[in-house]
Amino acid sequence: MKANHIRILLLVTIAIMFISLMGKWEQTFPADNTKQQTSATQNNSHYDNADSSTNTDVTITDAKSSLAKETNFSKYDNAKSITINTVVFKDVKVSLLDGAIISASLKDYSISLDDKTPMSLLTDKSGSEYIAKSTIVVNKQPISVNFEDQGIKIENSKQILTLTGSADGLQITRTYTFDDTKYNISVSQNIKNTTSAPVNVIVDDSFARDFDPAGDSFSLLNAHSYTFTGVAYSTAKDSFRKESFKDISKTNGQPTVINSDGQGWVAFLQHYFVSAWIPQSTNAKIYYKNLNGDVFEAGAFTGATIAPNQSENISSILYTGPIIKANLVDLAPNLEKTLDYGMLSFFSEIIFWVMNHIHSLVGNWGLAIILVTCLIKLIFYPLSAKSYRSMAKMRMLQPRIKRLQETYKDDRQALGKKMMELYKEEKVNPLSGCLPMLIQIPIFISLYWVLLESVELRQAPFIFWIHDLSMKDPYFVLPVLMGLSMFLQQKLSPAPADPMQAKVMMFLPVIFTFLFASFPSGLVLYWLTNNLISISQQWIITRHYQATHKK
């Protein structure tokens, strides 16, 4: 295959393959969960397996009925609630009905650039409810507990809310511990059996969310549509799995149950943010399902048999906040994997680590992107220089190549042979010009995911009109400049001998400009910076080579 064919193929690969393949990989080809998952048909109910001493069967209909009651959002409308504020949380509302957390806003993350109101990650807003709850289940039936507020105690930098309640012969004391500067909430409950018989109890820590999966559709020209919205979980056997809400909605309401085989966690995952329940027991079960069409539920339940006049302590950690690796890595094994940079995550993590350190020095993510690009070009300069020297040599050989094409225009086989002899004689590799593009492909894809998934770059400004590097350029200035830089770079490269190839190459800057118009402006900034540095390097090397090799 000719060098220009390969160059065109590489350019198209960068522009199209990574968009259509990388952007949709996890959604189009989800991991096979069948080995570790058990459907509701096999287990009758996700409550059946919570405790090995419980053998009574529960029908699927009974399970659906109990779950539907748990996600009756309107029951919290008239219930009293306690409001807590911390350094990172605004208006965390804990309902006295069942102790559900029905609202939590994040002070450091506004809704948008225009609306500086703290975004509500958990919310009781009608039509978009998203709550975290801890339900007590007795003999496979969820019970409703009307808690009483025992006040908030402050210890060091922590606020401890205590609720007490009783139902079905159980006395329940639940505490919520808020660390002022952290997004994790410790939820601990002491359950005492005041009856004369043993009681099988389940604590079901779960999320319920009203979400329309039809609105979560993929668009080639919307980079943010490539992000994931759905359930994520981790067990001893499966370190990290995801299931989109769209796929869960196709399960006809049947819950999927996973045996954690040790400590695991379950989460609702969305762009930039995650809410996760982390049970502290080793016998928890994890489940997720679709309820009532657009309502989704996922949770982890822990079972215990409590003897008469005895009590059991069951604890969990609730995290609801931004996906920041430093916040997650110590909370639970593999929770940091919710920061998913895709198939090239190894390179993405290195790029982000370098960018983050540069940002700590310069204070601007746009400058950090430019400096990272300069650093990458410096690291790969020896390879690039070799490639540009080869391209300069190819450029000087163009007159001889044209003469060969005229001489052997009717004999393509002879032309190919003579061309190879010429390349061998002059010690030039016609494919070496493709090397810079080959190097860029993994870096481009890795940086793409860093810009798309790192919450640190959400609403991060650069200069002038670029107010958010994670969003497209509102005036398309950077994409146009990037297209012009590609056009200029082509002028420095050897012209394709084939007229058709030449026309295709001429149109590529236009195609790239159109595609990049919808990409995050930070990514376009990287590509523009990379092109400008490449142009400078190629121009200097080409002039030097021509000056020292004139015949």
Curated annotation (Swiss-Prot):
Entry's Gene Ontology cellular component terms: plasma membrane
Transport in keyword set: yes
Disulfide-bonded cysteines: none
Keywords: Cell inner membrane, Cell membrane, Chaperone, Membrane, Protein transport, Transmembrane, Transmembrane helix, Transport
Keyword DNA damage: no
Superkingdom assignment: Bacteria
BP GO annotations: protein insertion into membrane; protein transport
Subcellular location: Cell inner membrane
Sequence segments annotated as region (Disordered): 33-55
CDD domains linked to this entry: 5TM_YidC_Alb3, EcYidC-like_peri
Chief place of localization: membrane
Transmembrane segments: 3-23, 361-381, 431-451, 504-524
PANTHER family tied to this protein: CYTOCHROME C OXIDASE ASSEMBLY PROTEIN COX18, MITOCHONDRIAL, OXA1
Protein name: Membrane protein insertase YidC
